[in-house]
Design a protein with these regions (language model features):
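Surface-exposed patches in mature extracellular/periplasmic domains of secreted proteins
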Residues: 22-41, 97-107
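Sec/Tat-exported extracytoplasmic proteins
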Residues: 15-22, 37, 56, 94, ...
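Catalytic cores and adjacent binding grooves of peptidoglycan-active enzymes
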Residues: 46-123
Length: 123
């Protein structure tokens, strides 16, 4: 997992806490830094975002799936639920979860969710 060096230790602590949490949330796929071109300004381009279990935690806008294939937190152990230890632990470290409506979305933020995505907000 590649992330910005300024948050690397925080990321180690987060994943250690997730691993040691009684919930034992199963993680099989993790993504972080991803260069998306000189004009891209997204958090993955800067190394300040992480995606977990992308296939089971889709990105969706107004009912149209943009990435991944499902989000079934009640039946799929790899799907991240709002009350999961993963969301709680990231939040305790100052990160936001894409499962919440994105306040900075340029269009209807209520219709956009990215359940795989966590963004570093800082302190």
């Amino acid at each position: 997992l590649s992330v910005h060096s300024a948050i690397a230790q925080d990321v180690v602590e987060i994943f250690t806490e997730i691993y040691n949490d009684p919930e034992q949330f199963p993680i099989h796929d993790v993504g972080g830094y991803s260069w998306r071109g000189d004009t891209a300004t997204g958090e993955h381009n800067c190394g300040t975002a992480i995606d977990i279990n992308a296939n089971e935690n889709y990105q969706i806008r107004d009912g149209q799936v943009l990435a991944g294939s499902c989000w079934e937190p009640e039946t799929n152990p790899y799907s991240i639920s709002p009350d999961s230890s993963v969301v709680r632990i990231f939040a305790e470290h100052g990160w936001s979860w894409g499962g919440d409506a994105w306040a900075y979305s340029s269009d209807d933020s209520e219709g956009y969710h990215d359940y795989m995505h966590f963004s570093y907000l800082g302190e």
